[in-house]
């Protein structure tokens, strides 16, 4: 089978275009096989006796993350909660600028939002976010200051289910629940016709119907990230939506733009809002890459940011993207 030769063949057998701007408004649809469900016997997570302690909740489910690394991440409750009432944790890190402008004022920090475990059964996505928190903390300076915001586990209910689940506690695929154009029409049709009502891809009863997707939507509206990094597994590719020239690789992951779905984060952020969205698909949902690969992906991301997003002191930053930005051509 082709899927055995290339995991990406399972992800995007073909892209169907509807022509002109209608394709952008409705989303570029993909016919996809059901997402692989990682099969593994996992330890039962710690009881929720200390709801403000992220490590007490998540540590037993984090591949390649020990107690020391988890504690060092210093995750704190954001104030928002999942559908089942679990805290949504985050961590902000500020990397200072190495230089100032000629006028003696530092450029405004670049805002970067890193999100893991949108799908609760993609455990390595949360672990990678925690590893990257450690790397961000060690950074001395960058050419422009960077305000990092990490949300390692957006879907804690799926992440901590007895068997980790792609969907949240109400059975909703959070990555199909964002308010993209014509969602009410296109998301149900896509789910019924393209996925054959795959329960792992149910978009929900309405856009932003879930507390977790509402929280992320609020972050994108108030934090106004100039880059969103969305971490997934296990297709082993790099995807990109939105303005700017995309990175060609992060570590071993090579760019292969797979299109957007009704209600997806890439569609909402990259196409509709004009925020660059880098989507990382790790090779495995349960096994972390080697440390050298984790560092290589991070270094490649920083190099791309330096080349495409950061601004030299003598070069004024471009105007912010309009909220209704659309790319000039359809993918």
Language model region names:
Residues 27-29, 36-91:
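Short glycine- and acidic-rich boundary segments immediately preceding or forming the N-terminal edge
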Residues 45-46, 111-116:
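Acidic/histidine-rich, surface-exposed loop or edge segments in extracytoplasmic proteins
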Residues 237-241, 249-250, 262-323:
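Active-site-adjacent mobile loop/cap segments within catalytic or ligand-binding domains
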Residues 15-34:
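Sec-dependent N-terminal signal peptides
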Residues 37-49, 315-331:
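Compositionally biased, proline/threonine/alanine/serine-rich low-complexity intrinsically disordered stretches
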Residues 90-108:
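Short beta-strand-to-loop junctions in surface cap/lid or active-site-entrance loops
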Residues 109, 113, 122-258:
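Active-site/substrate-binding loop(s) of hydrolase catalytic cores
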């Amino acid at each position: 089978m082709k899927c055995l030769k290339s995991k990406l063949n399972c992800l995007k057998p073909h892209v169907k275009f509807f022509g002109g701007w209608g394709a952008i408004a409705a989303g570029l649809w993909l016919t996809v096989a059901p997402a692989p469900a990682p099969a593994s016997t996992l330890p039962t997570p710690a009881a929720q006796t200390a709801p403000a302690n992220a490590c007490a909740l998540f540590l037993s489910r984090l591949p390649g993350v020990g107690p020391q690394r988890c504690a060092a991440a210093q995750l704190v409750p954001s104030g928002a909660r999942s559908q089942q009432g679990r805290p949504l944790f985050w961590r902000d890190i500020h990397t200072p600028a190495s230089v100032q402008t000629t006028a003696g004022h530092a450029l405004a920090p670049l805002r970067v939002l890193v999100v893991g475990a949108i799908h609760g059964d993609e455990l390595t996505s949360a672990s990678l976010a925690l590893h990257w928190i450690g790397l961000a903390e060690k950074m001395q300076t960058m050419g422009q200051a960077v305000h990092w915001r990490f949300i390692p586990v957006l879907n804690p209910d799926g992440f901590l289910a007895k068997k980790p689940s792609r969907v949240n506690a109400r059975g909703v695929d959070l990555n199909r629940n964002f308010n993209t154009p014509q969602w009410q029409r296109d998301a149900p049709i896509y789910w019924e016709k393209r996925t054959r009502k795959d329960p792992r891809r149910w978009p929900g009863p309405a856009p932003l119907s879930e507390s977790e997707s509402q929280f992320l939507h609020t972050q994108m509206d108030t934090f106004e990230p100039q880059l969103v990094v969305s971490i997934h597994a296990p297709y082993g590719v790099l995807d990109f939506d939105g303005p700017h020239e995309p990175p060609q690789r992060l570590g071993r992951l090579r760019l292969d733009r797979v299109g957007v779905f009704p209600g997806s984060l890439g569609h909402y952020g990259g196409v509709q809002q004009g925020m660059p969205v880098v989507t990382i698909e790790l090779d495995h949902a349960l096994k972390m890459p080697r440390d050298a690969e984790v560092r290589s992906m991070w270094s490649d991301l920083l190099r791309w940011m330096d080349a495409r997003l950061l601004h030299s002191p003598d070069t004024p930053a471009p105007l912010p993207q309009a909220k209704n930005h659309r790319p000039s051509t359809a993918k």
